Amino acid sequence: MKKFLITLLLGVFMGLQASALTHQEINQAKVPVIYEENHLLPMGFIHLAFRGGGSLSDKNQLGLAKLFAQVLNEGTKELGAVGFAQLLEQKAISLNVDTSTEDLQITLEFLKEYEDEAITRLKELLKSPNFTQNALEKVKTQMLAALLQKESDFDYLAKLTLKQELFANTPLANAALGTKESIQKIKLDDLKQQFAKVFELNKLVVVLGGDLKIDQTLKRLNNALNFLPQGKAYEEPYFETSDKKSEKVLYKDTEQAFVYFGAPFKIKDLKQDLAKSKVMMFVLGGGFGSRLMEKIRVQEGLAYSVYIRSNFSKVAHFASGYLQTKLSTQTKSVALVKKIVKEFIEKGMTQQELDDAKKFLLGSEPLRNETISSRLNTTYNYFYLGLPLNFNQTLLNQIQKMSLKEINDFIKAHTEINDLTFAIVSNKKKDK
């Protein structure tokens, strides 16, 4: 799963209270709730993640999940987009609906004094969404305009092409925005069917944070959501990453080459190997001082930035990277990426590289979890991956104790990273 963003920052002090997990029964469904109370500021947020409500489930209606979420942002049928937005703004309430690859996500942010009203607005939206022809046509127009803009977004095109090469003939190869043809075919009945499919309580995960009394907040949520059916739990499909080492080039009117690349990264046990994968990818291509950055940018001057990172979700495990270079150095840059990765897999890293990686990761990881929003984001991600909620401390301990032999044995065991696929946006007339 891709991870959700909670924008509300409710404090910069660490460790005031660890995030915790409980369950709330709503209409006889046992809904997991991740929460953390923090009373520094009189603010709160509620995040609802409906598993299976993302673009992965679009099937032959590409763009439906995204369009559905955007129509939900058009307010209620009674008030419309403007009237509903004004009602929220009067009390400084923020209510936003979005999708990721796997989930539909509703984020509600509010001042403590308006918590009850915020949850009431949420209930009104779900009870009577603005499923009207006017709202549908408005969102269709917005999405078609976005698709038109994407035609000249070379990063988007290269990234989408890489997905299509790595996950050919699977839902992961599809564009979340859909196509012009698929968007135009979506009807009001499709939105109503999507609502019934997505909003089931057994697919729901709740995240709460801020100046809340959790028991009271959950009672209010129960009242807002208990009209939804139990439904069935979401079962994630898993997709293998291509190891065909293909190279796909799209020719456009561009002055630069946009190079995206990826490969399988077969991790069987995240609890044992997540720390090693973090160290491995940091040294290979995680920033300044990494192998890719030092050789491609510093020594060769071929790109301003280059990286590679791991991507672990319940639906796929793979590594992916990116660089942008001159058209004249495109071929050389691609060859150099292959060479650097191959040498790294064969020989591993040095003790100095391991020490530097430990210093950076052990110093930066705690900073990434110093706000309540970032802590809950991390906790939700661990919950999603099936890891303990407090896995962050385990991760830091594993990094601290990691030996050079341990990390190099791990690196040398993952020869599949050599099976790189490239997706490139270039210019046929100028790439020589």
Swiss-Prot record:
Keywords: Secreted, Signal. GO terms for molecular function: metal ion binding. One of its GO terms (cellular component) is extracellular region. It comes from the Bacteria. It holds the Pfam family Peptidase_M16_C. It is found in: Secreted. Residues 1-20 form the signal peptide. The keyword Secreted applies. The keyword Methyltransferase does not apply. Its main location: secreted. InterPro entries: Metalloenz_LuxS/M16 (IPR011249), MPP/UQCRC_Complex (IPR050361), Pept_M16_N (IPR011765), Peptidase_M16_C (IPR007863). Belongs to the peptidase M16 family. May contribute to the full activity of the protease PqqE. This is Non-peptidase homolog YmxG.
